[in-house]
């Protein structure tokens, strides 16, 4: 599982519309970790 790459991707995607939804999920994973 590429968590590092996913985290960075979430930050960038968070700016996008669809990315915003994905970003939220990523944030939850980061907090859970």
UniProtKB/Swiss-Prot annotation:
**GO molecular-function annotation terms?**
hormone activity; toxin activity
Q: Where in the cell is it found?
A: Secreted
For this protein, the parts annotated as crossing the membrane are none
List keywords of the entry alphabetically. Disulfide bond, Hypotensive agent, Secreted, Toxin, Vasoactive, Vasodilator
InterPro entries from the xrefs? Natr_peptide (IPR000663), Natr_peptide_CS (IPR030480)
Disulfide topology: 10-26
Q: Name one Pfam family in it.
A: ANP
Keyword Disulfide bond attributed: yes
What GO cellular component entries does it have?
extracellular region
Q: Mainly resides where? A: secreted
Write the signal peptide boundaries. none
Per the database entry, which stretches of residues form a coiled coil?
A: none
Q: Give a brief account of the tissues where this protein occurs.
A: Expressed by the venom gland.
| Any Gene Ontology biological process | vasodilation
Task of the protein: Snake venom natriuretic peptide that shows an increase in perfusion pressure, urinary flow and glomerular filtration rate. Reduces total and proximal tubular transport of sodium. In the aortic ring assay, causes a relaxant effect in endothelium-intact thoracic aortic rings precontracted with phenylephrine in the presence and absence of isatin, a natriuretic receptor antagonist.
Concerning its family, UniProt says: Belongs to the natriuretic peptide family.
The name under which this protein is listed is: Natriuretic peptide NP2
Organism, by scientific name, is Crotalus durissus cascavella
